[in-house]
């Protein structure tokens, strides 16, 4: 089996307490053909020196230091400087199972799919819970994935970037980027755009990513109702475009509207 280059992107902002563990989990991957992009987003702690220390001992690591501009701009800059056949994203508070990249790449190569979606563990203190929906099996078509997506439209499993493997050629050919004006659901918007241009999707039932619940993060706090409504309203055109492109918009329009309305009901 071939070993294509995988670019692992880590956006970093004031992540010193957990950063070494995150980087070590990437360095110790059993899949070794990696380009590791550590992108410091103007951290005010010792995150940058930690990155520089690891870059001195691992030639696969490239450290990029930028003025603070937000996670979306940081990811976009890394995407534009990545060289891998595939892209993988890791948040600096989290860590990977040692087999994470190997399993993602093996699944991608054996199925020739455009995206691999893996289960993950949510870590809350000493408690770990596995999250995910899809079962391993034949690749899903674009239409199949779109149907599954609306069963759990607000889930991290479909929405985030860090439990997935992406073909970089699709991202580059269609200039897919994170929306730098959004501070919530920017991952989901990126994925909706990617799904528009990808043809096949497969699942990995093994949990390969450990997501550390952070009570100070925007994803762990109660999002302001007005902002949540604004964000979901801005997502609507992308939903409509995706489901129109694949001929499912009229069929799934009620579910899409229900997802938008649920913000007001549950926020």
Feature-to-residue mapping (PLM):
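N-proximal low-complexity "stem/linker" segments adjacent to membrane-targeting elements
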Residues: 1-27
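Short loop->beta transition adjacent to catalytic acidic/histidine clusters or analogous donor-positioning motifs
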Residues: 3-6, 27-38, 46, 58-62
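Acidic helix N-cap motif at the loop->helix transition within catalytic regions
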Residues: 20, 45-53, 95, 99
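A conserved acidic beta->alpha catalytic loop
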Residues: 25, 40-50, 67-69
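Glycine-rich, basic loop-to-helix element that forms the pyrophosphate-binding segment
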Residues: 66-82, 95
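Donor-binding/catalytic cores of nucleotide-activated saccharide
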Residues: 71, 92-202, 209-227, 247
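Short aromatic/hydrophobic "clamp" motif used to bind/position activated sugar donors
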Residues: 87
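C-terminal subregions of glycosyltransferases and related glycan-biosynthesis enzymes
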Residues: 208, 212-267
